[in-house]
Amino acid sequence: MGEHSPDDNIIFFKGEEDDLTPHDKMLRFVDDNGLVPSSSGTVYDRTTVLIEQDPGTLEDDEDDGQCGEPLPFLVEGEEGFLIDQEAMSQGYVQHIISPDQIHLTINPGSTPMPRNIEGATLTLQSECPETKRKEVKRYQCTFEGCPRTYSTAGNLRTHQKTHRGEYTFVCNQEGCGKAFLTSYSLRIHVRVHTKEKPFECDVQGCEKAFNTLYRLKAHQRLHTGKTFNCESQGCSKYFTTLSDLRKHIRTHTGEKPFRCDHDGCGKAFAASHHLKTHVRTHTGERPFFCPSNGCEKTFSTQYSLKSHMKGHDNKGTAYSALPQHNGSEDTNHSLYLSELGLLSTDSELQENSSSTQDQDLSTISPAIIFESMFQNSDDPGIQDDPLQTAALIDSFNGDAESVIDVPPPAGNSASLSLPLVLQSGISEPPQPLLPATAPSAPPPAPSLGPGSQPAAFGSPPALLQPPEVPVPHSTQFAANHQEFLPHPQAPPQTIVPGLSVVAGAPASAATVASAVAAPAPPQSTTEPLPAMVQTLPLGANSVLTNNPTITITPTPNTAILQSSLVMGEQNLQWILNGATSSPQNQEQIQQASKVEQVYFATAVPVASGTGSSVQQIGLSVPVIIIKQEEACQCQCACRDSAKERAAGRRKGCSSPPPPEPNPQPPDGPSLQLPP
């Protein structure tokens, strides 16, 4: 092989004569163009220099292969480099060394050659006449510790700008501010804002279009079947780009070549963009700005910015009152929580609730409690939109007249919370409720299973006071998901004053009648509220595909629910799995969402089970919050390992045994799940 450059020595190869070899065809091509062929026909060396305009773009991980890879302009199936002259769009210079002469061929190609040769990229390819093996000179990055190589000097120069931080081309679109290494990359990025997609697929029946030729060619591999397939045993995945295949192979090998060089960190990643996102946790960089007027929030990832922008887009409907539904309309969308990202986390609720502990109970209004749950925190990445909060409070106050009037209780003696039941489908009859009996001793704390915190649904010592022991990771609901009773659209329940409804199943008519006939226990200082059962159908959800319902059963003397009650991720997961009975939806569950925090919010509008007017049940409506996992944004193969790890964690989850049912007094909260 021979490689010729100003710094290389000339290496000659002696080849045997062969009348049918591709280089003889090249000699005929040279002869047709007026050059004198060699008398012997023997070629010692053939070197081609490709002259191309510097593209100024560098696809991530697309050109980092090892030495010896063919260049993209080579014609598949051809043995010679320049046999098919029409397929060579770039200009080239070729010289052929023979025993008695040197042939020099200059072809400008079908695309214009650069006017200034200094702005061009010269790619050298050499072919051994004996073995017909071609070799492309690779350009090695000279920065210490960088193993990247490139087939063109232009791509190498672009890559080296990443080491120097030369992101000089900045997007001037409002609210963007992204910077790029080359002007070409900036032009491609602007098409994201303008929605321009000039490269359309020409396959009949396919209407897809793309903003770059690179993405179009990758898409067309799906039509031609020339994809990059994973050859690992048992893996049948395929990809449209070589870089995606390389990233996927790392999920099999466990290779993580991108390592954080900050002191004391040492974390490694399989993809370079994951490392870039991680480095921002050290530097505190937040390059993504919210473009909305009056919003000065910044974010470290584009995913976080998009999640935040949904709050601005849905500002008029995110927390507004429910739309008016006729009795015949579908009520699956009666629970509106379209923007879950703006709700406070459990730690924020504990911190914010302490500010209202010293207030007089008679002065605490629903709006004050609700506003305290949405107060802004110091972290700009998780701050809540004040306009969104104001709209939410207004929507609550707008329906305040429909809330049942509650006389203020004396002191802090009575503070109860709400049980919660998830039900789906129809398979078994509901279990009868235990009769309410008057207590002869102080009511014991409800039994919630091993490892649970008794403060989950117990009466707190003071109103709005968080529990002494945090419970974000405790087991709050101890039962197997198969034991949840399926529940049809329940008819409205009879309102019975002084009745304590036990969570687990709707109260039957016989149970209600027996409870009415029994004498009511003596009350202390407060007037009991009528207990009611409200069935809420959940909206359509990618996880809860069977539209399970939430049965909310307030107990008498209901007050304000503690804002720091948390259900563990493990326990909620089997609730979701139980609600999703279709086996074909398991893959959807694995990819759809991740339970990050579960806590109880207040003042959420709900709809009546009979389709009547919108009604709000005080301040004690429990809500399950499912936050979307912040996953990789790149649509790349590096997400495969994360899916496998998530599936492994779900297989290892085991639910604790169900607790024994215990009768509860009327004044105490009840949490009893069906056997």
From Swiss-Prot:
One of its GO terms (cellular component) is nucleus. Gene3D superfamilies: Classic Zinc Finger. Ubiquitously expressed. PROSITE patterns: ZINC_FINGER_C2H2_1, ZINC_FINGER_C2H2_2. The modification Phosphoserine is found at residues 5, 304. Pfam families: zf-C2H2. Transmembrane segments: none annotated. One of its GO terms (biological process) is DNA-templated transcription. GO terms for molecular function: cis-regulatory region sequence-specific DNA binding; DNA-binding transcription activator activity, RNA polymerase II-specific; DNA-binding transcription factor activity; histone acetyltransferase binding; RNA polymerase II cis-regulatory region sequence-specific DNA binding; zinc ion binding. A motif (Nuclear localization signal) lies at residues 132-137. Residues 427-464, 645-675 are annotated as: Disordered. Zinc-dependent transcriptional regulator of cellular adaption to conditions of exposure to heavy metals. Binds to metal responsive elements (MRE) in promoters and activates the transcription of metallothionein genes like metallothionein-2/MT2A. Also regulates the expression of metalloproteases in response to intracellular zinc and functions as a catabolic regulator of cartilages. This is Metal regulatory transcription factor 1. It comes from Mus musculus.
